[in-house]
Amino acid sequence: MPGEFSRRDFLQTSGAALAAAGSSSLANHSNAIDEPFAARQERRRKELWGLLGDLPWNHRPEPPRLVSREDHDGYVLERLVLDLNGQEPVPAVLLIPKKRAERAPGLLFIHWHAGMYDLGKEQLVRGVKAQPAYAPVLAEKGIVTLAIDSWCFGERKHEQDGGQGEQDAFKLMLWRGQVLYGMMMFDEFRAMDYLAGRPEVDASRLGAFGMSMGSTKAWWLAALDPRVKVCMDVCCLTDYEELIRTHALKDHGIYYYVPALLKHFQTADINELIVPRAHLSVNGRRDPLTPPAGVEKIRDRLMPLYREYGKEEDCRIELFDCEHVELPEMRKVILEWMDRELVG
């Protein structure tokens, strides 16, 4: 991205053009979708981006810095520092399978919150009790996978008290006209730019995947960026009104709250921007973060749209008998979905 670019120039010459004007990309993805629906998605996608505060669209990223390369069983792990936003460097890990296609599918693995501010991107390799590590599985499937530290997490945790650091970041950004969640999503979007540009990656096969906070960010990213051909989210397809009704606002971190969002969007409205691309969502029926009635409401809104465009098999929204955890049977569904929609 050369020279002194205006925001308009930037949008025309980078991946942001796809996210800001996604109808053309979506039309290319599926001839089944009609033009009025695609045009509405384009308009609403721009509106959704507009709620995320002042974003550094004009920032010209510096080249990534390779910190180290680690040899693991079945994959090489590159440790990187990416320049995504111009405000602070973003540590990242890139998993490159040793056995893969010349142009392999790419996946953005988005870490969770759970108050584990020291974990961040390392969740990909280490896993957590509620979700065992995905690195070996993704390596076996030949999926090139990128994970970054979100604002306030991992190597971007700047306060000893991580929760206080998150609150301070939220408040300071509000003063500056920014939104913490907006800056988080901008980083994930820019990370997708980097992943799509890697020589190992087939940019026509890109996915987003995460649990909890990572789940929320996965479906938001798929809504904001039509390059995401496969969205997989675990334990956080949360209907906002149902969250209010069940008095569960306290269960989500401060990062989650976007000013004025409910004046313009409900959860189903955001997820409608993913149609007709592949979307898998698995959730716990006993998870207070994701009230089951809300999951069912979203499913009942989306499934008729997928059915209308002949893509019913490309949307699956399920509830399992569990709390905030990925069950083995949920993982089985996820891996089958990866094989069919991303690898195959």
What is each stretch, according to the model?
Residues 2-4, 9-29:
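N-terminal export signals
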Residues 3, 24-45:
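C-terminal segment of N-terminal export signals and the immediately downstream linker at the start
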Residues 60-100:
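N-terminal cap/lid segment of alpha/beta-hydrolase-fold proteins
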Residues 110-186, 242-245:
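Cap/lid segment of the alpha/beta-hydrolase catalytic domain
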Residues 167-211:
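Gly/Ser-rich "nucleophile elbow"/oxyanion-hole loop immediately N-terminal to the catalytic nucleophile
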Residues 174-175, 190, 230-271, 276, ...:
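Mobile cap/lid helix-loop segments that gate and shape the active-site cleft of serine hydrolases
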Residues 254, 300, 305-344:
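C-terminal catalytic histidine-bearing segment of alpha/beta-hydrolase fold enzymes
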Residues 281-283:
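Short beta-strand/loop motif that positions the catalytic acidic residue
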